[in-house]
Amino acid sequence: MYAENYKRLEQLIDKLREFNGVILVEGMRDEVALRKLGVETEIIKLSRFPLAEIALTASHYHDIMILTDFDRKGEDLAKKLTQYLEGYKCRVDTNTRRELKKIAKKDIKGIEDLYGLYLRFKSLRF
């Protein structure tokens, strides 16, 4: 089970590293975790501006990935952002978040813990 999750997590991290759009996260710690994983693309933090303003800024990118936390607040933010962005006819990836949640739901609560989970899985040496 852990070996499968680790392999899938590595695939998703590779996807994040190769992503050429903008990633929307809740806060600074989320961005730091993604940077530690080698993600170099543009990242916008939701905690800085109203959602409508963030959606407008993000709509200038061709591809947008929403990576909010896995709690109720994160779910609500992801839904609202998706609605705003679909109004701008943007291509929005919420599947990556859903996949990460499926793999890590018992181990972490959100994106800021992703780097730690990756290190734990890696240390198990499958």
From Swiss-Prot:
UniProt cross-references to Pfam families, sorted A to Z: Toprim
Cofactor note: Binds two Mg(2+) per subunit.
PROSITE patterns xrefs: TOPRIM
SUPFAM superfamilies: Toprim domain
Domain of life of the organism encoding this protein: Archaea
Gene3D superfamilies referenced in this protein's UniProt entry, alphabetically: 3.40.1360.10
Name of protein: UPF0292 protein TSIB_0423
Obligatory cofactor(s): Mg(2+)
Keyword Magnesium: yes
GO molecular function: metal ion binding
Residue ranges constituting the Toprim domain according to the UniProt record: 20-100
